């Protein structure tokens, strides 16, 4: 392949949800609401955990605060571009912007997978080894596990990105069935045989998501099996239910997209909305609605701030 041919394509056209202006205007309002909800919900959890002494010292809530930060970052990788594209007929993205988006999508996404696995281990220790919980899940270990999650995401994303940028792109340049740059649809546009690359990438992304999901489900199953009393099992199920809901909402779509041979389907676009937009929006609701301690801390935060504002007014 001639070098000039491989450098012809320096931009991609993303697939939108509609070409009808009135429909796109409605979708813009809907996704703007989703994105604002993501910011409000996740920032509120981070502020609540940081301002409450009990929550801030608890390993579970320390990890929850980090999960909220990852959710915020994850949605920000794709949603602002999506909102802007509702006003752009061509929905254009440069090659460099595409690679950057792809890198951070897999960086933050993989880090969140690893962190959810860490949170499952935290619940296992808390429920099955309660007497050793504070010793095992020390703040130092929590920081190491969070850092390891970020590092794991970075390594995973670096591998995916390096494999992608070494491919020649000379046309076509229409990224099918997605509103952002992701590995499966982008490498389909390469002017080369990508079979081996696809196997490597499926092994990378597919195995990470599938193995993490299996480990998570196994952890929660072990928790329920080890508890003998009905009351203890009921409490454990109540505690784990929110985690299981988050895990299913996030891992289900990811496994569907990444743990298969690289072929695109029309449903991929809607599946991508689930783990890029809907899950980060629902996570704060799932964790706060079922958690009395978080709700109580939020109420204290509102009361404290309300009293502060009243003092400032007087």
Swiss-Prot record:
Residues bearing attached sugar chains per UniProt: 4
PANTHER family on file: OLFACTORY RECEPTOR
Cited PROSITE patterns: G_PROTEIN_RECEP_F1_1 (PS00237), G_PROTEIN_RECEP_F1_2 (PS50262)
Superkingdom as given in the UniProt entry: Eukaryota
GO cellular component, one term: plasma membrane
Primary site of residence: membrane
Protein name (Swiss-Prot/TrEMBL): Olfactory receptor 4Q2
Task of the protein: Odorant receptor.
Record keywords: Cell membrane, Disulfide bond, G-protein coupled receptor, Glycoprotein, Membrane, Olfaction, Receptor, Sensory transduction, Transducer, Transmembrane, Transmembrane helix
The UniProt record lists the keyword Cell membrane: yes
SUPFAM superfamilies listed in its UniProt record: Family A G protein-coupled receptor-like
Keyword set includes Ion transport: no
Transmembrane residue ranges: 27-47, 62-84, 99-119, 143-163, 197-217, 237-257, 269-289
């Amino acid at each position: 392949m001639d070098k000039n041919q491989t450098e012809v394509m320096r931009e991609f056209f993303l697939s939108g949800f509609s070409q009808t202006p009135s429909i796109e205007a409605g979708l813009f309002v809907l996704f703007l609401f989703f994105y604002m909800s993501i910011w409000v919900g996740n920032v509120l959890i981070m502020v609540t955990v940081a301002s409450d002494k009990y929550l801030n010292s608890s390993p579970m809530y320390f990890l929850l605060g980090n999960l909220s930060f990852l959710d915020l970052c994850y949605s920000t990788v794709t949603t602002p571009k999506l909102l802007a594209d509702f006003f752009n007929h061509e929905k254009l993205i440069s090659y460099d912007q595409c690679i950057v988006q792809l890198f951070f999508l897999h960086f933050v996404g993989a880090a969140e997978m690893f962190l959810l696995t860490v949170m499952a281990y935290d619940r296992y220790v808390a429920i099955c080894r309660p007497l050793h919980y504070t010793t095992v899940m020390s703040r130092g270990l929590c920081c190491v596990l969070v850092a390891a999650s970020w590092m794991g995401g970075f390594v995973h994303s670096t591998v995916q990105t390096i494999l992608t940028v070494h491919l020649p792109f000379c046309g076509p340049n229409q990224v099918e069935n997605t509103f952002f740059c992701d590995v499966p649809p982008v490498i389909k546009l390469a002017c080369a045989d990508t079979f081996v690359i696809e196997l490597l990438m499926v092994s990378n992304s597919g195995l990470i998501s599938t193995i993490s999901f299996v480990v998570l489900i196994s952890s929660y199953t072990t928790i329920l099996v080890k508890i003998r009393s009905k009351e203890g099992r009921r409490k454990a199920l109540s505690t784990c239910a929110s985690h299981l809901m988050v895990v299913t909402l996030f891992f289900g779509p990811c496994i569907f997209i990444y743990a298969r041979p690289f072929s695109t389907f029309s449903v991929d676009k809607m599946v991508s909305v689930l783990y890029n937009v809907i899950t980060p929006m629902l996570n704060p609701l799932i964790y706060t609605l079922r958690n009395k301690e978080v709700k109580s801390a939020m109420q204290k935060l509102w009361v404290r701030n309300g009293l502060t504002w009243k003092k400032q007014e007087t």
